[in-house]
Design a protein with these regions (language model features):
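Short, surface-exposed linear motifs at loops/turns and structural transition points
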Residues: 26-141
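Sec/Tat signal peptide C-region and signal peptidase I cleavage site
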Residues: 21-25
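Bacterial N-terminal signal peptides that target proteins for export
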Residues: 1-10
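Bacterial N-terminal signal peptides
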Residues: 9-20
């Protein structure tokens, strides 16, 4: 006859094994990478203040890794967009589009900035999408 402490130990070990080792049904394979990713809406400036701006844009679902990054490349010279800001987004495999939202901070008042947006997979590989260069001017403080 097995004592109650041994039964408890065996039950605990079994539960631990069952829940710590995910089965194939629990871990989804990476989504198929889209053949072509395109910006379908935006980029739109949601807010422009003297020091902060929010950018939002929507692309077709890029697939691939579950985590992607929206990146804003910006600067005061349209030929030098070397400053960047990025934000992580989780891709919803069941949705045809993905929304990116990135904040850019530390801007100067009454300054014209040029920008473009791109996106990448979590490993840094480009989604192959890039907006045209646009501009905005921050208001005075």
């Amino acid at each position: 006859m097995i004592g109650p402490l041994v039964k408890l130990a065996l039950t605990t070990a079994l539960v631990s094994i069952l829940f710590s080792n995910p089965t194939a049904a629990q871990v989804l394979p990476p989504a198929k990478k889209a053949a072509r990713v395109a910006i379908t809406k935006g980029p739109v400036l949601e807010l422009v203040s003297d020091y902060l701006t929010f950018f939002r844009w929507i692309t077709t679902n890029p697939g691939g890794s579950d985590v992607h990054f929206g990146i804003v490349h910006y600067g005061t010279d349209p030929k030098d967009l070397s400053q960047t800001a990025k934000s992580e987004v989780r891709v919803n495999r069941g949705h045809p589009e993905t929304m990116f939202r990135v904040s850019v901070e530390g801007l100067k008042p009454r300054t014209t900035y040029y920008y473009k947006v791109t996106s990448t997979e979590s490993g840094g590989k480009s989604d192959g999408v890039e907006s045209p260069i646009s501009q905005f001017t921050t208001p005075k403080s």
